[in-house]
């Protein structure tokens, strides 16, 4: 299972520029660690999925960021599942990880087609099978 996530910096850390205070530096590092860990995404246990650490690109937060630019996080992860046919759902923990996040749009592409599910706070469950 391949996963891609794009999250605006404002929703993840409350700002979209290079950190200007020690607190912002810590907040940015924490957000990167949470996204890297992959703990915000839990596949159905029956599928037996594992993933190496995700790849996280934090764009717009370094010293070279354009003033007034847009900062965001792009995350990719590849899960390997022992029983992919049993991958019926996901639990998305982004609301717990990022308290200002209000909505997550999940685009799902499977062998049986494509669909979209919208999660509004506090929803966390995504159904993958029809």
Locations of regions flagged by a protein language model:
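N-terminal soluble domains immediately following signal/targeting peptides that reside
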Residues: 1-130
């Amino acid at each position: 299972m391949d996963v891609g996530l794009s999250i605006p910096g404002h929703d993840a850390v409350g700002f979209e520029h290079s950190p200007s205070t020690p607190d912002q530096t810590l907040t940015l590092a924490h957000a990167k660690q949470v996204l890297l860990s992959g703990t915000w995404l839990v596949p159905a246990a029956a599928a037996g999925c594992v993933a190496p650490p995700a790849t996280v690109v934090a764009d717009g937060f370094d010293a070279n960021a354009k003033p007034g630019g847009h900062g965001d996080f792009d995350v990719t992860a590849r899960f390997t599942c022992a029983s992919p046919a049993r991958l019926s759902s996901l639990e998305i923990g982004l609301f717990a990880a990022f308290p200002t996040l209000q909505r997550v749009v999940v685009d799902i592409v499977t062998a049986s087609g494509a669909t979209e599910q919208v999660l509004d706070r506090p929803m966390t469950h995504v159904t993958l099978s029809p």
